[in-house]
Amino acid sequence: MGQIGIWQILIIALVILVLFGRGKISDMMGDFGKGVSSFKKGLNEEDKPAEPAAKIEGPSHEAKPAGEAAKDPRPADKQG
């Protein structure tokens, strides 16, 4: 009783075909194929050595020393 036979599989396939239509199923399978090929491409790229990281340059302007910035402890809106 718990086994699925060929007739049950054919009926399920027919219901799916009627619900989604032939065009929608072919679109889904095409998208699935693109996903698999993209996944394989990603795996192949992982094997390649990574390019060296770009050098990060420091700031182009000089920062003020911390003492100069904190001379007046009042908030900026209350100065004056």
Curated annotation (Swiss-Prot):
One of its GO terms (molecular function) is protein transmembrane transporter activity. Gene3D superfamilies: 1.20.5.3310. Keywords: Cell inner membrane, Cell membrane, Membrane, Protein transport, Translocation, Transmembrane, Transmembrane helix, Transport. Residues 38-80 are annotated as: Disordered. One of its GO terms (biological process) is protein transport by the Tat complex. It comes from the Bacteria. Its main location: membrane. It is found in: Cell inner membrane. It is a single-pass membrane protein. One of its GO terms (cellular component) is TAT protein transport complex. Residues 58-80 have a biased composition (Basic and acidic residues). The keyword Cell membrane applies. The chain crosses the membrane at residues 1-21. The Tat system comprises two distinct complexes: a TatABC complex, containing multiple copies of TatA, TatB and TatC subunits, and a separate TatA complex, containing only TatA subunits. Substrates initially bind to the TatABC complex, which probably triggers association of the separate TatA complex to form the active translocon. Belongs to the TatA/E family. Part of the twin-arginine translocation (Tat) system that transports large folded proteins containing a characteristic twin-arginine motif in their signal peptide across membranes. TatA could form the protein-conducting channel of the Tat system. This is Sec-independent protein translocase protein TatA.
